[in-house]
């Protein structure tokens, strides 16, 4: 990186060329250092097949460079032009209903189609060759938001053939596929790979093993589609040019873990107050997106699209309050962003996103948004220059697995049980206490964490069980939850013993029965008796989650082997049996939470874990903040930057030691204004 810090997504092709110098001048005055361009400009760069026109983009890059602004170029594969669709209609995607998704939006492409891939290779090669020596170009973005418009996943003939080849490579023989998928059920056996279709709409249900492999295949397909482009670019441009992609938080169409292996770093698109929401994201929801994306590469990242104003397609969302736009940008930095690029520079006059407002309004005349973002950039730029490469440090990790999410998306087990929802619930419990969290892969080195939370480890194998066991034996505290060890990796139910299957020895329990609660709730009480679920009158709580100690959605009926109970159910026919357990193993402990905890139960569990392991808040003894105020930090070479973020619309009193030096923000008389922030040197 070269300290870019702040930028904007710029579409010069949307405006008369005589306007470009004015835009560049206004960007410089604002403090912008980088723009992203061209990711939706295929027709402008190739108005007809084989005829390339990059001269307009040369001029735009040069105008910006003269004002000290460098450019990131996006490959345009997210929006093939109309002339291509007319010549090759089969490059359009086909949904599970067999209907072709047509031209007129974006991502109207099949990423497996060989004809389309050839066009992509040609345009990417032409761009790389043309811009490789341009001093104004510093990096490349591949495509745009993989998966954003591909939720149905293309099921055309090309994808069918590619899926069959993928299966043949994975299973070698059709007999192995039949075994892995359990095709004996409903007479689904195959005699040849050519008989296997994508999981199209059927009269009655679908094979969960087939659907899981389909999701795996499509993730691999997207990664391969991206790698075709990254390989071309790397073979042509200087090694100093970076390659990235703008991801979308917990979107799971493609594994960002796999995708990131071909990138220099990842980017994230953050819209806390999207038009599709009735209110802005809660602060913990912003935090979990940012920490989740940082966990993809275990490194600082960029925000390639940071909300700058009102968003909208057919309808528009609410206007962010004064101070929220800067606060959200600083929040991104606090969680690991080295550069923040605002979407977009100027509100577009036409097209689907004409109501997706930018730094400049439709008129192009700078207003309050421009001024507010300008104050932010002036305030934060000196800090961010010094902070580049610094990372948040965490003692707690949450395991995130794309395959676990896919499997539970196929079979949630009970209504509203969602894999990512569970990750976020555990994250929030630590976030509320200002305890930082990292997100990790299942096979990552866990030894640096005091606590590792692994929700819904639905698919399991012996390697995963051994990995977790080694972590615990070496002194770690592992938390597994309901539905752990239910299935093998092929999505067939585990049959070699009671649940939690391969985790039984580690956890010191068995689960031979369970109660799929759905919307019901079961009271829970502490085994020690120091905490219980009774109100002031001594009556047990009603069977709603509320603020009581309750189990919801699911109740594993646990039999203790070597484990000890921590919380017991206090109702239903299994009253008195454990809901939460702990098992000592080696130098560490393995905890099991056999339900979805209510908020109060979750808080009690996290308090217990923090006390047991000595896990500390960022606040420590030198900073005390009220509810609604977040404290987090980044560290580098022994230096620490502390961020205090007021996510409320009220002024907040902050108690801090005088040993801290205020670097930026508006902390005055130990008070933070509504939606205010402060960065301290600690």
Kindly give the residue locations of the regions a language model identified.
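An acidic-aromatic substrate-binding cleft motif
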Residues: 1-19, 26, 30-33
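The substrate-binding groove and active-site-proximal loops of carbohydrate-active enzymes
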Residues: 6-17, 40-55, 102-121, 146-150, ...
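Conserved, mostly hydrophobic/aromatic
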Residues: 8, 27, 35, 64, ...
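Short, solvent-exposed turn/loop segments enriched in Gly/Ser/Thr/Pro and often Arg
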Residues: 11-13, 38-41, 74-83, 138-147, ...
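Short, acidic/polar
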Residues: 15-29, 120-126, 248-259, 321-329
């Amino acid at each position: 990186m070269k300290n870019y810090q702040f930028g904007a997504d710029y579409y010069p092709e949307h405006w008369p060329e005589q306007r470009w110098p004015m835009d560049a001048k206004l960007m410089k005055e604002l403090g912008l250092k980088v723009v992203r361009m061209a990711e939706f400009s295929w027709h402008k760069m190739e108005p007809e097949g084989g005829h390339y026109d990059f001269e307009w983009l040369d001029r735009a890059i040069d105008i910006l460079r003269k004002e000290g602004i460098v450019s990131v170029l996006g490959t345009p594969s997210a929006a093939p032009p109309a002339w291509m669709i007319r010549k090759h209609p089969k490059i359009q995607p086909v949904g599970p209903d067999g209907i072709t998704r047509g031209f007129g939006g974006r991502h109207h492409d099949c990423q497996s189609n060989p004809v389309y891939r050839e066009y992509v290779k040609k345009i990417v090669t032409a761009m790389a060759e043309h811009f490789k020596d341009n001093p104004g170009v510093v990096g490349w973005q591949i495509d745009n938001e993989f998966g954003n418009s591909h939720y149905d996943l293309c099921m055309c003939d090309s994808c069918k053939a590619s899926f069959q080849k993928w299966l043949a490579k994975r299973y070698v023989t059709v007999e192995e596929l039949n075994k892995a998928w359990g095709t004996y059920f409903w007479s689904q056996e195959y005699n040849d790979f050519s008989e296997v279709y994508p999981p199209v709409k059927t009269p009655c249900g679908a094979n969960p093993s087939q659907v899981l492999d389909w999701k795996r295949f499509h993730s691999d397909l997207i990664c391969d589609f991206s790698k075709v482009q990254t390989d071309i670019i790397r073979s042509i441009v200087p090694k100093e040019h970076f390659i990235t992609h703008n991801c979308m938080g917990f979107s799971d169409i493609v594994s960002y873990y796999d995708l990131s292996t071909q990138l220099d770093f990842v980017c994230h698109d953050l819209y806390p107050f999207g038009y599709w929401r009735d209110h802005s994201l809660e602060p913990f929801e912003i935090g979990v997106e940012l920490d989740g994306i940082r966990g993809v590469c275990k490194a600082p990242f960029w925000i390639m699209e940071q909300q700058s104003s009102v968003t909208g397609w057919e309808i528009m969302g609410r206007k962010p309050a004064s101070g929220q736009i800067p606060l959200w940008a600083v929040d991104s930095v606090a969680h690991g962003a080295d550069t923040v690029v605002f979407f977009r520079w100027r509100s577009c006059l036409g097209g689907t996103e004409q109501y997706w407002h930018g730094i400049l309004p439709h008129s192009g005349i700078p207003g309050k948004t421009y001024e507010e973002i300008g104050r932010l950039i002036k305030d934060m730029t000196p800090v961010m220059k010094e902070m580049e490469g610094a990372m948040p440090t965490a003692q707690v990790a949450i395991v995130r697995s794309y395959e676990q999410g896919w499997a539970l998306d196929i079979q949630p087990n009970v209504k509203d049980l969602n894999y990512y929802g569970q990750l976020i619930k555990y994250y929030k419990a630590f976030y509320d206490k200002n305890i930082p969290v990292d997100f990790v892969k299942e096979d990552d080195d866990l030894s640096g964490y005091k606590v590792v939370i692994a929700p819904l480890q639905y698919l399991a194998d012996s390697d995963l069980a051994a990995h977790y066991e080694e972590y615990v034996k070496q002194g770690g505290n592992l938390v597994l939850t309901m539905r752990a060890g239910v299935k093998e990796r092929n999505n067939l139910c585990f049959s070699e013993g009671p649940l939690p299957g391969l985790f039984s020895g580690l956890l010191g329990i068995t689960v031979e029965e369970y109660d799929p609660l759905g919307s019901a709730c079961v009271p829970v009480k502490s085994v020690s008796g120091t905490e219980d679920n009774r109100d002031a009158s001594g009556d047990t709580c009603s069977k709603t989650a509320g603020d009581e100690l309750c189990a919801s959605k699911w109740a594993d009926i646990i039999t203790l082997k070597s484990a000890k109970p921590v919380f017991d159910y206090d109702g239903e026919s299994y009253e008195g049996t454990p809901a939460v357990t702990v098992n000592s193993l080696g130098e560490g402990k393995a905890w099991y939470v056999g339900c979805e905890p209510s908020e109060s139960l979750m808080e009690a569990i996290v308090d217990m874990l923090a006390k047991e392991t000595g896990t500390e808040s960022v606040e420590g003894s030198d900073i005390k903040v009220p509810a609604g105020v977040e404290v987090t930090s980044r560290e580098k070479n022994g230096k620490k930057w502390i961020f205090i973020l007021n996510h409320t619309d009220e002024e907040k009193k902050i108690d801090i030691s005088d040993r801290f030096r205020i670097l930026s923000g508006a902390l005055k008389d130990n008070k933070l204004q509504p939606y205010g922030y402060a960065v301290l040197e600690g």
